[in-house]
Amino acid sequence: MHIRLATESDVPAILSLIHALAVYEREPDAVQLGEAELRRDGFGTQPLFECLIADDEGEAAGFALYFPIYSTWRGPSIHLADLFVQPSHRSRGIGKALLERVAAIAMERGCGRLQWDVLDWNTPAIDFYRSRGAVMLESWRIMRVTGAALARLAKSSSPGT
């Protein structure tokens, strides 16, 4: 098994892993993008994300999808959107290797922070992250606007402001 940067040819495997993660996270119908969007957003002229693949003899055993963000407190940072290992490949250090590689990339890029979200019921993941030095920010909550609410909010904007 080795960790490598994903290429455009990995898009079908990445999408499959995203769907598997959605099932694990109890939201099997939440994924609304397809291969075309992943190709455009990750492998186009201005990539919005990067992805690592845990390659086990040609099989995508897991992945880590991340992107740059900016912290007004810490400067350049990375947000880890997804970290997932196929159930058949767990307990072999793959998740640890993926997380460590993303952390190394953050350090190489001079980032002051690596952050991600975790579901409150996902105690195996919480324990895994805590065992690697992560701290749960109990007082922070995620706010999100999607779909019609996003369109309404955008429509409220005055031109030129």
Task: Label each residue range with its predicted role.
Residues M1-S9, L150-T161:
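Conserved N-terminal entry element of GNAT/NAT acetyltransferase domains
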Residues W116-A125, R144-A148:
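Conserved beta-strand-loop-alpha-helix junction that forms the acyl-donor binding cleft
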Residues M107-D117:
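Conserved GNAT acetyl-CoA-binding A-motif
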Residues R130, S139-L150, A154:
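Acyl-donor-binding surface of acyltransferase catalytic domains
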Residues V85, S91-A104, S131:
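Conserved acetyl-CoA-binding loop-helix of GNAT-fold acetyltransferases
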Residues A81, Q86, L119:
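Residue-level recognition of the GNAT/N-acetyltransferase active site
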Residues L5-P12, S16-H79, L99-E100, I105, ...:
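Acetyl-CoA-dependent GNAT
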Residues Y66, Y129-R130:
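Conserved active-site tyrosine of GNAT-family acetyltransferases
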